[in-house]
Amino acid sequence: MTSLGLVMENSQVLPAFLLCSTLLVIKMYAVAVITGQVRLRKKAFANPEDALKRGGLQYCRSDPDVERCLRAHRNDMETIYPFLFLGFVYSFLGPNPLIAWIHFLVVLTGRVVHTVAYLGKMNPRIRSGAYVLAQFACFSMALQILWEVAHHL
């Protein structure tokens, strides 16, 4: 058995983190694909060579829907990347498995709802609530990491 297999066999938390983080990375890929599809549908290309290939330089332009997709993707990068670090470290602190699952599922749910609300142009309160909820879980993990580190200095 590999060393990762041994770690996962002895921990209920790491597999939960790996599941949620992998789903979030797949969600980020989905947003990237959606962005590309919106670019094609709206004929709004970022590079002149792409525009020339698709009809002419007039299509090297911005579009509000493409910009919305890009903002959603950027927001993912600003929030999911820190979660990947925090959740990984938190997994090795020996947290209560149920509490860890709750943290990970709150982040996963918050980020999925945020993306759906953002791309679907839903009520901004839904998007903001989902953002805050996911950030709260990350902040909680960060505080627990700092607490553990401070006790070992």
UniProtKB/Swiss-Prot annotation:
UniProt xrefs under InterPro entries: MAPEG-like_dom_sf, Membr-assoc_MAPEG, MGST1-like
Cofactor(s) this protein requires: glutathione
Catalytic activity of the protein: prostaglandin H2 = prostaglandin E2; 2-glyceryl-prostaglandin H2 = 2-glyceryl-prostaglandin E2; prostaglandin G2 = (15S)-15-hydroperoxy-prostaglandin E2; 1-chloro-2,4-dinitrobenzene + glutathione = 2,4-dinitrophenyl-S-glutathione + chloride + H(+)
Gene Ontology terms, MF aspect: glutathione binding; glutathione peroxidase activity; glutathione transferase activity; prostaglandin-D synthase activity; prostaglandin-E synthase activity
Cytoplasmic side stretches: 43-61, 121-124
Membrane topology of the entry: Multi-pass membrane protein
Intrachain S-S bonds: none
Residues the entry annotates as binding glutathione: R39, R74, N75, D76, M77, E78, H114, Y118, R127, S128, G129, A130, Y131
Keyword annotations: Cytoplasm, Fatty acid biosynthesis, Fatty acid metabolism, Isomerase, Lipid biosynthesis, Lipid metabolism, Membrane, Oxidoreductase, Prostaglandin biosynthesis, Prostaglandin metabolism, Transferase, Transmembrane, Transmembrane helix
Induction statement: Up-regulated after treatment with LPS or in a rat model of adjuvant-induced arthritis. Down-regulated by the anti-inflammatory glucocorticoid dexamethasone.
The UniProt record lists the keyword Nucleus: no
Any single GO CC term annotated in Swiss-Prot or TrEMBL for this entry: membrane
One Pfam family here: MAPEG
Signal peptide (from-to): none
Site (Essential for protaglandin-E synthase activity): D50, R127
A GO BP annotation: sensory perception of pain
Stated regulation of activity: Activity is increased following LPS stimulation and down-regulated by the anti-inflammatory glucocorticoid dexamethasone.
Gene3D superfamilies in the cross-refs: Membrane associated eicosanoid/glutathione metabolism-like domain (1.20.120.550)
Residue spans crossing the bilayer: 14-42, 62-91, 99-120, 125-153
Keyword Glycoprotein attached: no
Lumenal compartment segments: 1-13, 92-98
Pathway given in the UniProt record: Lipid metabolism; prostaglandin biosynthesis
Assigned protein family: Belongs to the MAPEG family.
Role played: Terminal enzyme of the cyclooxygenase (COX)-2-mediated prostaglandin E2 (PGE2) biosynthetic pathway. Catalyzes the glutathione-dependent oxidoreduction of prostaglandin endoperoxide H2 (PGH2) to prostaglandin E2 (PGE2) in response to inflammatory stimuli. Plays a key role in inflammation response, fever and pain. Also catalyzes the oxidoreduction of endocannabinoids into prostaglandin glycerol esters and PGG2 into 15-hydroperoxy-PGE2.
PANTHER family xrefs: MICROSOMAL GLUTATHIONE S-TRANSFERASE 1, PROSTAGLANDIN E SYNTHASE
Protein name, per record: Prostaglandin E synthase
